[in-house]
Amino acid sequence: MATEAREQFDVAVEPMRLRDLGDILKIERLSFPTPWSRYAFLSELLENDRAYYLVARAFPVGQPRPRRARPVGYAGVWLVLDEGHVTNVAVHPDFRGYGIGRTLMEAVEDLVREKGGKRMTLEVRRTNLVAQTLYRSLGYKSAGVRRGYYRDNNEDAFIMWKDL
């Protein structure tokens, strides 16, 4: 599927590495009012055998991929039994609106499918209309509300599901 992102730059999606954490933490701080800590990511990458994290690296169209292209976005998922639970998705503000979030979500869904997953679930802030629109365009449906889910402001989260 072609996206605007691929018209301006190419995107490679691959597993997150420990050396990506500095860039990931910057994206995290720019994206969320209560960002995850370095320790939280280290715990996910090193200790959680159900966790999978992907990064998107962008580079100019038609150019060979640089050896050290920096991450411009990332997504995480837990695979529990046959269900993928999206833990987080974020794209650097300079790269938003180019389809990178969609590319990451599609890659996460592919990963879950390859590992035998049958469905996906996630929570999204009630006020995050951009993310809700993306998830609906990917086939996610609202399945309920988690009241006061987000600790920073007690905001509700919509629960969304999708069969793969």
Regions found by a protein language model. Give the residues of each.
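Acetyl-CoA-dependent GNAT
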Residues: 2-7, 15-98, 105-115, 163-164
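Short beta-alpha junctions and helix-cap segments that line functional grooves
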Residues: 41-42, 145-147
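Well-formed, non-transmembrane alpha-helical positions, independent of function
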Residues: 23, 133-134
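Conserved SAM-binding loop
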Residues: 13, 97, 123-124, 142
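C-terminal "cap" of GNAT-fold acetyltransferases
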Residues: 2, 6, 17, 53, ...
